[in-house]
Amino acid sequence: MSRNEEQYLNLARRILETGASKMDRTKTGTHSIFGAQMRFDLSEGFPLLTSKKVAFGRIKSELLWFLRGDNNIRFLLQHHNHIWDEWPFKKWVESNEYKGPDMTDFGLRTQKDPIFAEQYKEQKKIFVDRILNDDEFSKKFGTIGDVYGKLWRHWPDANDDGSVDQITRLINEIKVNPNSRRLILTAWDPETTPFATLPSCHVMSQFYVVDGKISLQMYQRSADYFLGVPFNIASYSLLLSMVAAQTGLEVGEFIHTIGDAHIYNNHVDQIKEQLSKPTHKLPTLKLNPDVKSIFDYEMSDIKLENYIHEDVIKAPIAV
């Protein structure tokens, strides 16, 4: 078993066995622990879990979306990525403009009521079609607020004379001052966070350069361990690899530090199934070496080789 994947599975067991029982914002309930860390040595392979299939295409398109500074899900939908749909959808069905059947607590009700689940699918299709084809509707209901990419690329300037592009500043600083202890990327703005559809979960990253290698530590305040964390591990490992490529450095470690690491009660059976599966050798990440800027990567410039995995394990998302 890969040491990189083993630590993910071991932490899953720890959460199941020792986690506190906590209610949460979504009314689903969790097994929760506070304070955990995993270290992934990227020289041992790209840390995309193999004990279940993880959709790498969605990870790629989400990270490219972040790097665009975008906060509207239209770009994701154009790439058949629906991981952010539920929160803007919730904003729409709770608005005065929504005229369809009652969608209260749709995340939980779809799991229990087959008739309601069909109604939900119909309304969700209407929502997606309008985001893709109706500019006014997309502008009003397709955004998720000032989180992630919006703050990475367009942090509000305190002097009100523009915005701060953290990514550009970060890469330039790595090139000219790699020993800096200020190689920080943040996505938590206390002023705008209360108005976000879903406040940023992975809130701060720090880059570290030594002996020609660059590493990245990310702090995540809240971690959906079964659905979210496998994406987060791969996404920040991909970001680290892209930054390394653009700064002429070798890739070191991705260090994942978590505050509230939780397994939702309706994910327990799924993660137990995953724990029963075999693991495989980690895949290899290949980036197009001809890409000159981190902002110029396209989906086709990012490839994964030799990804051997177990089957998909589906689970409902807590909204």
Curated annotation (Swiss-Prot):
Cell compartment(s), UniProt: Cytoplasm
E.C. code: 2.1.1.45
Keyword terms, alphabetized: Cytoplasm, Methyltransferase, Nucleotide biosynthesis, Transferase
Entry annotation: catalytic residues: 201
Residues the entry annotates as binding dUMP: 25, 181-182, 221-224, 232, 262-264
Catalytic reactions on record: dUMP + (6R)-5,10-methylene-5,6,7,8-tetrahydrofolate = 7,8-dihydrofolate + dTMP
Example GO biological process: dTMP biosynthetic process
Domain of life: Bacteria
Function: Catalyzes the reductive methylation of 2'-deoxyuridine-5'-monophosphate (dUMP) to 2'-deoxythymidine-5'-monophosphate (dTMP) while utilizing 5,10-methylenetetrahydrofolate (mTHF) as the methyl donor and reductant in the reaction, yielding dihydrofolate (DHF) as a by-product. This enzymatic reaction provides an intracellular de novo source of dTMP, an essential precursor for DNA biosynthesis.
PANTHER family: THYMIDYLATE SYNTHASE (PTHR11548:SF9), THYMIDYLATE SYNTHASE 1 (PTHR11548)
Membership in a protein family: Belongs to the thymidylate synthase family. Bacterial-type ThyA subfamily.
NCBIfam families in alphabetical order: PRK01827.1-2, thym_sym
Protein name: Thymidylate synthase
Organism in which the protein naturally occurs: Oenococcus oeni (strain ATCC BAA-331 / PSU-1)
